């Protein structure tokens, strides 16, 4: 679990161009597609229930994001997720806004129960709510959690048998046994809508080329954070930062990860 390992995964993405099937939200769908392209993978954004089984069968990872939820979309997620499980395609779930409304919380829990999720990625509030901790969410924003987020993530991951990612100033990645802390990133990333969704897309791209999803998730977050740091150095505000972030991901080299990844083992 060294930066060299993370860099090798980036090289595998660029060489293999894995197909990442998204069922995601209307607010950030274009950003998710573009961030997937910039890292070197291929996005497809299909969510019609009539076609998702066929599409996911040819994919290398499936990213589910409940940001703009509907009953039809949840049905499509179930169809796609079951096919992904049958085809051994890793599933990444981003439970956007879980804890804000009962529908979001129930839908996220149902997907966790019905599917084998490889990676659950959310903020501390979303993950805390799903783990049964005392957490507060307003809209899609995290307000607070009454417990240590590392302990919450670790216990939840071990109990559910999944990799849990909590995004924040320091990202937490754990499977219940191992805990990695990723310190890369910049505060400007929190001032731009959709960076959490983009992180889930990158988690899908890296999961597509790795069996160890603790390593792949940490690699995705380190790569995203390094690109964010580089973007902040040249941006004058949130929207120029957005453009620089995409440019930074597209220009990211394996050596940038080797030299720039700041990851700690807890």
Tell me what each language-model feature is:
Residues 104-179:
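Conserved phosphate/ATP/ADP-binding segment of small-molecule kinases
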Residues 2-13, 162-184, 256-258:
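Acidic-glycine-rich active-site phosphate/pyrophosphate-binding loop
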Residues 150, 154, 180-193:
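Short pre-catalytic strand/loop immediately N-terminal to key active-site residues, enriched for Gly-Thr
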Residues 186-203, 213, 238:
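Short glycine/threonine-rich catalytic loop with a Thr-x-Gly-x-Asp
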Residues 65, 73-122:
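Glycine/small-residue-rich loop that forms an oxyanion/phosphate-binding "nest" at active or ligand-binding sites
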Residues 21-34, 46-58:
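N-terminal glycine-rich anion-binding loops that anchor highly charged ligand groups
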Residues 203-242:
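Conserved post-catalytic alpha-helical subdomain immediately downstream of the catalytic base
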Residues 226-266:
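Charged C-terminal helix
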């Amino acid at each position: 679990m060294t930066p060299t390992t993370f860099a090798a995964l980036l090289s595998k993405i660029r060489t293999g161009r894995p197909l990442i099937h998204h069922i995601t939200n209307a607010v950030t769908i274009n950003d998710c597609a573009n961030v997937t392209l910039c890292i070197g993978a291929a996005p497809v954004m299909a969510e019609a229930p009539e076609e998702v089984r066929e599409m996911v069968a040819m994919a290398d990872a499936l990213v589910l994001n409940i940001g703009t939820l509907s009953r039809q979309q949840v049905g499509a997620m179930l169809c796609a997720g079951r096919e992904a499980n049958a085809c051994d395609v890793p599933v990444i779930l981003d439970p956007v806004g879980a804890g804000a409304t009962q529908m979001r919380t129930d839908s996220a829990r149902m997907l966790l129960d019905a599917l084998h999720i490889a990676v659950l990625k959310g903020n501390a509030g979303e993950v805390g709510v799903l783990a049964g901790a005392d957490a507060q969410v307003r809209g899609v924003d995290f307000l607070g959690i009454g417990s240590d987020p590392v302990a919450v993530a670790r216990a939840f991951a071990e109990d559910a048998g999944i990799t849990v990612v909590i995004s924040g100033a320091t990202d937490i990645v754990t499977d219940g046994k191992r805990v990695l802390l990723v310190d890369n990133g910049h505060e400007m990333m929190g001032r731009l809508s959709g960076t959490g969704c983009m992180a889930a897309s990158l988690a899908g791209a890296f999961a597509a080329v790795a069996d160890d999803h603790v390593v792949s998730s940490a690699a995705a977050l380190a790569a995203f954070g390094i690109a964010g740091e580089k973007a902040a150095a040249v941006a004058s505000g949130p929207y120029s930062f957005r453009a620089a972030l995409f440019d930074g991901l597209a220009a990211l080299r394996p050596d940038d990860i080797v030299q720039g990844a700041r990851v700690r083992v807890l």
